[in-house]
Design a protein with these regions (language model features):
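Substrate-binding pocket helix/loop in short-chain dehydrogenase/reductase
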Residues: 98-99, 106-111
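Conserved glycine-rich cofactor-binding loop
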Residues: 8, 15-16
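Active-site helix of classical SDR
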Residues: 122, 158
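C-terminal helical subdomain
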Residues: 179, 183-184, 203-247
Length: 247
């Protein structure tokens, strides 16, 4: 993994779960981090911990649904480190429910965060990476981006969209500008994603599968693997599923 040391990595959704685990793994490998999320207290605590252990980290309070917030986050990376080598588009939400429940506000928010948020991240870093003629964008999808299931229709649709965006980015930029694109699709992972469920049916499903998910460290390891590959190799797609679940 010698290809990670010194790289400037922007991570969204860095205050907990996969984002936090990825930040810690990359800091151990010598990356310079810009951590973005909405919860400043969690971000600052993580950045302080990384610095205390000898790493480098800055943080920016940002909502990926805001294109301006993502531009400011990229600006912080450029001001602090002068380049952006990697973006980990990790932020996401999962207030799942059946379509018949008509939770339109949840649908809108999932589209804003899970789809527009990915695009806002790309828009913030792509000009920099094109000028550098190098870079790597890692987008977090889900196994729900491969198969639709009841209660997960809109969430799955957002993750199908992330797959399409990532593959399109790869086709447009890889050969033309040397920018790599990787899709990482986790199955059930022990994060905060299920904490905000309001649908009674979805809460019941979450309770049945509680404790069967993977540690966020497993997904962080996959992200680190993709980033650490030599520049002449591009890991296009990684799916990681928990052993305890067939779904």
């Amino acid at each position: 993994m010698d290809n990670i040391a010194g790289k400037v990595v922007v991570i969204t959704g860095a205050s907990s779960g996969i984002g936090e685990a990825t930040a810690k793994r990359l800091a151990e490998k010598g990356a310079k981090l810009v951590l973005a999320a909405r919860r400043e207290d969690r971000l600052k605590a993580l950045a302080d911990e990384i610095v205390r252990l000898g790493g480098e980290a800055a943080h920016a309070v940002a909502d990926v649904a805001s294109a301006e917030d993502m531009r400011k986050t990229a600006g912080l990376a450029m001001e602090r480190y002068g380049r952006i080598d990697v973006l980990v588009n990790n932020a996401g939400i999962m207030p799942v429910s059946r379509l018949s429940e008509l939770r339109v506000e949840d649908w809108d928010r999932m589209i804003d965060v899970n789809v527009k948020g990915v695009l806002h991240g790309i828009a913030a870093v792509l000009p920099v990476m094109r000028e550098q003629r190098s870079g790597h964008i890692v987008n977090l999808s889900s196994t729900s981006g491969y198969a639709v299931s009841p209660t997960s229709v809109v969430y799955g649709a957002t993750k199908f969209a992330v797959r399409a965006i990532t593959d399109g980015l790869r086709q447009e930029e890889s050969a033309a500008s040397g920018i790599r694109a990787t899709l990482v699709a986790p199955g059930l992972t022990e994060t905060e994603l299920l904490n905000g469920l309001t649908s009674p049916e979805a809460r019941a499903i979450a309770e049945r599968i509680k404790g069967l998910g993977m540690s966020p460290d497993r997904i962080a390891d996959a992200i680190v693997y993709a980033i650490g590959q030599p520049d002449d190799a591009s890991v296009s797609e990684i799916i990681v599923r928990p052993t305890a679940l067939a779904m």
